[in-house]
Amino acid sequence: MAFEDLLDDPVVQKYLHELVGPKGMPVAAAPPDGEVTDEELAERLGLELNDVRRALFILYENDLATYRRVRDEDSGWLTYLWTFQYENVPGNLREEMDRLLEALVDRREYELENEFYLCEVCSIRFEFGEAMDLGFECPECGSAVEAMENTDLVDAMDDRIERLRSELAVEA
């Protein structure tokens, strides 16, 4: 996938937005060619320097940017020259999907192995042991808690797990 096409993909845009947030999105969405300083980016994008630096470090922590330090011989100050590494985005998304699949499988197992009770007034859910300790009464409002059917939730998880496994080409 070409670099420009990658940034046009709504999934990639959402991923970057989740990483850097709304203040960092201009930094993530408009990476320059070659090296650039944080000051240059802040000036070009009209952003606060701290917001640019925060976004750059988040991108760095996620292997989407690298930097090299150059010391000014006159002042002794360090300048950081940043390069964007968006070719790592597909791999990062794959890792996120793998983590999501693992979490869903674990959660599905938890849902199947436990019996739940619900306070319909407060919408608080309790495991059987906790409900029993509470005398099957909600500690918030005193209403009786009722056995909760979670088949729809498990079915939705099954569907999502199946779709993720299909997208990732992973077998059960």
From Swiss-Prot:
GO terms for MF: DNA binding
Domain HTH TFE/IIEalpha-type: 8-90
Lineage, highest ranks first: Archaea, Methanobacteriati, Methanobacteriota, Stenosarchaea group, Halobacteria
Record-linked SMART domains: TFIIE (SM00531)
Keyword ATP-binding: no
Record protein name field: Transcription factor E
Function, in words: Transcription factor that plays a role in the activation of archaeal genes transcribed by RNA polymerase. Facilitates transcription initiation by enhancing TATA-box recognition by TATA-box-binding protein (Tbp), and transcription factor B (Tfb) and RNA polymerase recruitment. Not absolutely required for transcription in vitro, but particularly important in cases where Tbp or Tfb function is not optimal. It dynamically alters the nucleic acid-binding properties of RNA polymerases by stabilizing the initiation complex and destabilizing elongation complexes.
Membrane-traversing stretches: none
Family of this protein: Belongs to the TFE family.
Assembly information from the UniProt record: Monomer. Interaction with RNA polymerase subunits RpoF and RpoE is necessary for Tfe stimulatory transcription activity. Able to interact with Tbp and RNA polymerase in the absence of DNA promoter. Interacts both with the preinitiation and elongation complexes.
Keywords assigned: DNA-binding, Transcription, Transcription regulation
Biological processes annotated in GO: regulation of DNA-templated transcription; transcription initiation at RNA polymerase II promoter
Domain notes: The winged helix domain is involved in binding to DNA in the preinitiation complex.
Keyword DNA-binding applies: yes
